[in-house]
């Protein structure tokens, strides 16, 4: 953790008071499960908290930045910014990946470079920072790391297949779109989800991914491809 602390101090002027919070943020469930006798905490609860504060700060930023955009447009842009792949890229930008504590199985399966884990790590770090320093410090960090990328328009062309599918189908009439997990496989540290996308209870396509969100995006992408071939 000493090297991580040095990184945070030199790159972001962040010094944690509660070092345990920082360590927990970088501890994956697979590591905690392999060391159960030590009663080690993992980062899922911090991820939950970080997700909430991230949504709040990005929502406020977009609301003030684009006073004439409708709610739907703001929601779409926010979803692009806070999606799994985007958050994983921010973890990489911050050089967080070498410091994640992973179980042996997760490490061997390439977990250190997996978007799901890196995205969750970024949210967990925000949760830890919130508890240790407060919301304004989280805002300062995001203004340094995320907002410059948003200002450059790097999230305006991200493929949001779920939104695209919804827009196409609803343009044809009233359509209720639903996503359902139909299968889960793999160990806890390397889950794989299969999702089916339905339109008015009629199956359109399926998708597979390392997270439910990614599987849903893949299902929507496959549905769009099928519709384009009709």
From Swiss-Prot:
InterPro entries: dsRBD_dom, RNase_III, RNase_III_dom, RNase_III_sf. Its cofactor is Mg(2+). Mg(2+) binds at residues 47, 120, 123. Residues 160-229 form the DRBM domain. GO terms for biological process: mRNA processing; regulation of gene expression; rRNA processing; tRNA processing. Belongs to the ribonuclease III family. Digests double-stranded RNA. Involved in the processing of primary rRNA transcript to yield the immediate precursors to the large and small rRNAs (23S and 16S). Processes some mRNAs, and tRNAs when they are encoded in the rRNA operon. Processes pre-crRNA and tracrRNA of type II CRISPR loci if present in the organism. This is Ribonuclease 3. The gene is rnc.
